[in-house]
């Protein structure tokens, strides 16, 4: 007896359909609206910075990749559904009136196009959305070339692994995805329409269903055979022997590699067996093939390599792995740029019987010993050169060098930026925050090897209030250009690290025609931006787009926005470089420099790979993290790399935001590939001006990665490498309390043994593996002539030279140091500066550490670090470790090396001219900015005696009164309170002097 087919799902009413459509449209607007807004504003921004071709190339590549994968996956699924539907049985027996399959079948039949086309389209769209993120893989495949280096196993060029293999893997993966989805789509369709029935003791499968499923399964196994072929190449990046070494090991090459070929052959045989299911009615052949494939994968692919590893390799690991460790050493050195042609190894005694006076090169090293720590002095810069409460400096300052008097001098440098976090009260109103307080003002520098004058010996007082401070050199709006020792044509700063911390990050500049200037410039003047940076928002469409982007209605309705207005956003130098060159990884630290009288930010950028054969893989985040990053919370790149090059250096103009990319490594194959993708985006090295090149530094993050690699890969002998007994370690920072963090590398000026002139180096001490004794000293040059040249001083293993942590303990426990520290700790915060390791005396090691104090005068009083003492440590030839401790480097040196203090640079003097050793330059009062905000002039301070003492006290009183007035004008209550306290002290001094 026939049965009435079950009814389908109830249809929706007209009102329900309208509401459903409205809900779908609203959801689409909510999901896609922000994306379209971002796309349009990015289009405008890339046009403003002149990199629209980059934007178009990326977008077009993503669209093509999206369309190709979506079409491929969607078409494959559609074809599978179509074949399954067309070959369905004509008559389908029903299990009963409540058969759930019949109900689903009726529903599908009633909406055949919805299911037959909608499902493939939806799956295709999802696949396309995922695939479009692989645009980098596609472009590198299309534009990649050769490295000129071959892998030691298959003798293929490294370019195959870097550019080709990832693309083949991507294509293979999407074929797997399409085949797997098609298989399950066919299976479900055949089940719904009766081609596959599971009723009874044994299920039944129609011939069309068997053929279709067998063919798809055979295709899957064929793809698996291809995957086994490519798996062979992936063995050269095996992590089986981590953490000992990276790359193919004995087991990988002698067991896993043959196993892959065996499995490939088995997979081909199994695929033939599945295809045989097309003509054979017996499914046992494909079933046996599937079982064979699984069993062989376990036995051949897993058990056999395990047996080889356990019973052949482990008992003889040093011998078995020796060849493969050699491969790993050679590849890692090549991939990380630490080959023998770039590194000069020198044996270094760690002790000497010479005096630095007898070694000509030491005059440059000691004379430029850095006493200012850029990671401590930000509060000092802020308090003494802030000018207004809304200006500020980054938490960690920078180091650069300038040649102002014919001698190279390193400076602590910073841009005086607008600090959004410092805005208070009505300054945070939208109109003020985004249209008035729009830019910073000036470039500030201080010579790194001296302060204005030494602290007094009165330790209990915590030092004097006008000594131990940097000697500032300022180029800003208030300093006439003829008085600027570092001339700056345009000191206004619209782009920087600090100003970009505004949330949201944008400023609106310009205004309606004839409108008065609005942007704050000084207490008596406003300014209107005239630079080429910024996106025009004079038209209503752009205003609407940015109002939607920032969810800010004021952008639409504010009268401060006129026809000539522009919006400046993406103001972080690193972010700007990362956006115009998304294929680069930027260094974590951009630094300001004055180049051709303009303030620019210099950003180091890297090309990287994660699949260089046999090269060690490391995490950038882990390799570059040190004590400074922990303090500042600097964002670190989170990616694994096995190849890195600093092939590009970028500049960002601080006024108009212009981004310029320069090639600095023409031999980098990865950069060559990207220049093929984005022709014209990177300027050739020949366009780098000598003025700009003079400010290039060897990048910190790259150095830290290479330093991490050199802890192991300085070893040549694979047996020593395997035992770890010759490894080094990065020392922990001994100046940090409350945790163990890597000591950061330090930029210092070291004497060049060939010329006896100072050379700007990035340096790091290295200690023995899991030990604290000094094992090596790494330095890399930043001067244009020998840029990137490493020198590694290797200390002997039969003597023990103290490392940074041991030296810190020795210095801080010295009787004089510990006694003064106890006296100071009651009313001062003690801060140790960077512990520098300096090679001197043709074999000796000198440690230099500045000792800062910061007064504890109350919770509402502004305090800031000042240099109080200088600590030095030196080990003589007899093995005795001597500690020097004084208010100047010269005095401290004389305590450990008699007479060597004459090589140290005296304190005080003109910030642009280095005083000659042994002279007494004029003392500079750095605590009071001049009336025009410029650079203070040196003032000679004679020793007060008799009536002169009263005159000096009176002059000091006048200065403190003027300081109170300046604090009142600035509106900074912290400065005002501090100025009042200092005025009271000056009054008492004057009264005492008159008695």
Swiss-Prot record:
GO cellular component labels: extracellular region; plasma membrane
The keyword Transmembrane helix is annotated on this UniProt entry: yes
Name of the protein this chain belongs to: UPF0182 protein NFA_45260
Membrane-spanning ranges: 18-38, 63-83, 115-135, 176-196, 211-231, 260-280, 288-308
InterPro entries for this protein: UPF0182
Organism of provenance: Nocardia farcinica (strain IFM 10152)
Sequence segments annotated as region (Disordered): 904-957
Record lineage: Bacteria, Bacillati, Actinomycetota, Actinomycetes, Mycobacteriales
Topology within the bilayer: Multi-pass membrane protein
Family of the protein in this entry: Belongs to the UPF0182 family.
Cellular compartment(s): Cell membrane
Biased composition (Low complexity): 927-938, 946-955
């Amino acid at each position: 007896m026939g049965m009435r087919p079950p009814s389908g799902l109830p249809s929706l009413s007209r009102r329900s359909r309208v509401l459903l459509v409205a809900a779908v449209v609203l959801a689409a607007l909510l999901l896609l609206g922000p994306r379209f807004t971002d796309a349009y504003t990015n289009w405008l921004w890339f046009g403003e910075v002149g990199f629209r071709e980059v934007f178009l190339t990326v977008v077009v590549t993503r669209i093509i990749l999206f369309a190709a994968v979506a079409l491929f996956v969607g078409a494959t699924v559609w074809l599978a559904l179509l074949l399954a539907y067309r070959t369905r049985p004509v008559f389908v027996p029903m299990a009963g009136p409540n058969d759930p399959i019949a109900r689903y079948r009726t529903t599908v039949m009633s909406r055949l196009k919805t299911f037959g086309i909608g499902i493939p389209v939806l799956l295709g769209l999802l696949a396309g959305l995922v695939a479009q993120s692989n645009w980098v893989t596609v472009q590198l495949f299309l534009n990649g070339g050769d490295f000129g280096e071959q892998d030691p196993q298959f003798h293929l060029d490294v370019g195959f692994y870097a550019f080709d293999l990832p693309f083949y893997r991507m294509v293979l993966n999407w074929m797997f995805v399409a085949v797997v989805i098609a298989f399950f789509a066919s299976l479900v369709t055949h089940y719904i329409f009766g081609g596959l029935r599971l009723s009874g003791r044994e299920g039944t499968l129609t011939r069309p269903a068997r053929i279709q499923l067998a063919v798809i399964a055979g295709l899957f196994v064929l793809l698996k055979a291809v995957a086994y072929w490519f798996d062979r190449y992936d063995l050269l990046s095996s992590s089986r022997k981590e953490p000992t070494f990276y790359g193919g090991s004995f087991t990988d090459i002698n067991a896993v590699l043959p196993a892959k070929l065996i499995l490939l052959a088995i997979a081909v045989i199994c695929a033939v067996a599945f295809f045989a299911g097309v003509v054979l009615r017996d499914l046992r052949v494909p079933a046996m093939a599937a079982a064979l494939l699984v069993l062989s994968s376990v036995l051949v692919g897993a058990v056999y390599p395990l047996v080889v590893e356990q019973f052949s390799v482990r008992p003889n690991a040093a011998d078995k792995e020796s060849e493969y460790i050699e491969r790993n050493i050679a590849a890692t050195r090549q991939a990380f740029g630490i080959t023998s042609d770039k590194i000069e190894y020198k044996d270094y005694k760690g002790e000497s019987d010479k005096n630095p006076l007898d070694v000509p090169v030491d005059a440059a090293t000691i004379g430029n010993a850095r006493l200012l720590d850029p990671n401590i002095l930000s509060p000092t810069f802020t308090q003494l050169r802030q000018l207004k409460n809304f200006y500020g400096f980054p938490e960690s300052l920078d180091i650069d060098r300038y040649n102002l008097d014919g001698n190279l001098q390193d400076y602590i440098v910073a841009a005086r930026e607008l600090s959004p976090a410092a805005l208070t009260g009505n300054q945070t109103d939208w109109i003020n925050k985004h249209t008035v307080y729009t830019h910073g003002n000036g470039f500030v520098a201080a010579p790194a090897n001296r302060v204005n004058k030494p602290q007094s010996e009165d330790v209990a007082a915590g030092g004097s209030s006008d000594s131990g401070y940097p000697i500032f050199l300022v180029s800003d709006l208030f300093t006439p250009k003829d008085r600027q020792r570092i001339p700056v044509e345009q000191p206004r700063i619209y782009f920087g690290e600090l100003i970009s911390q505004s949330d949201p990050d944008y400023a609106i500049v310009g205004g309606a025609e004839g409108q008065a200037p609005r942007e704050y410039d000084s207490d008596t003047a406003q300014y209107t931006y005239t630079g080429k940076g910024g996106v025009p928002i004079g038209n209503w469409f752009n205003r609407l787009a940015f109002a939607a982007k920032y969810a800010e209605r004021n952008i639409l309705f504010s009268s401060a926005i006129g026809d000539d207005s522009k919006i400046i956003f993406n103001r972080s130098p690193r972010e700007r470089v990362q956006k115009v060159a998304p294929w680069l990884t930027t260094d974590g630290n951009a630094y300001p420099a004055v180049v051709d009288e303009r303030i620019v930010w210099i950003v180091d950028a890297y090309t990287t790979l994660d699949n260089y054969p046999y090269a060690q893989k490391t995490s950038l985040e882990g390799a570059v993290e040190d004590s400074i990053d922990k303090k500042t919370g600097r964002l670190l790149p989170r990616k694994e790399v096995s190849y890195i090059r600093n092939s590009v250096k970028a500049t960002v103009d601080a006024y108009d935001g212009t981004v310029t990319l320069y090639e600095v490594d023409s031999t980098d194959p990865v950069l060559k590939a990207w220049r093929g993708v984005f022709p014209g985006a990177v300027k050739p090295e020949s366009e780098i001006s000598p003025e700009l090149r003079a400010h290039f530094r060897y990048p910190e993050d790259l150095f830290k990665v290479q330093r991490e690699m050199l802890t192991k890969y300085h070893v040549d002998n694979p047996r020593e490498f395997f035992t770890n007994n010759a490894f080094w370690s990065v020392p922990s920072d001994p100046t940090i309390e409350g945790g163990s963090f890597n000591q950061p590398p330090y930029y210092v000026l070291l004497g060049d043994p060939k010329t006896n002139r100072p050379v700007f180096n990035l340096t790091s001490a290295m200690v023995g593996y899991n030990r604290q004794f000094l094992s090596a000293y790494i330095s890399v040059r930043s001067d244009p002539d020998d840029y990137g040249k490493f020198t590694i001083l290797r200390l002997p293993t039969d003597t023990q030279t103290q490392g940074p942590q041991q030296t810190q303990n020795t210095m801080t426990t010295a009787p004089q140091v510990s006694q003064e520290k106890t006296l100071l700790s009651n009313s001062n915060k003690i801060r140790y500066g960077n512990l520098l390791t300096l090679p001197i005396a043709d074999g000796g090691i000198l440690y230099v550490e500045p000792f800062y104090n910061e007064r504890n005068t109350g919770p509402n009083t502004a305090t800031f670090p000042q240099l109080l003492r200088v600590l030095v440590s030196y080990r003589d030839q007899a093995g005795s470790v001597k500690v020097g401790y004084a208010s100047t480097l010269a005095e401290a040196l004389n305590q450990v090396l008699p007479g060597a203090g004459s090589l140290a640079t005296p304190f005080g003097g003109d910030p642009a001219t280095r005083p000659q050793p042994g002279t007494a330059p004029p003392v500079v009062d750095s605590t009071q900015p001049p009336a025009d905000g410029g650079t203070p002039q040196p003032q000679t301070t004679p020793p007060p005696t008799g009536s002169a003492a009263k005159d000096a006290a009176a002059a000091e009183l006048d200065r403190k009164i003027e300081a109170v007035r300046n604090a009142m004008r600035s509106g900074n209550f912290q400065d005002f309170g501090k100025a009042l306290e200092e005025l009271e002290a000056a009054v008492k001094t004057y009264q005492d002097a008159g008695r």
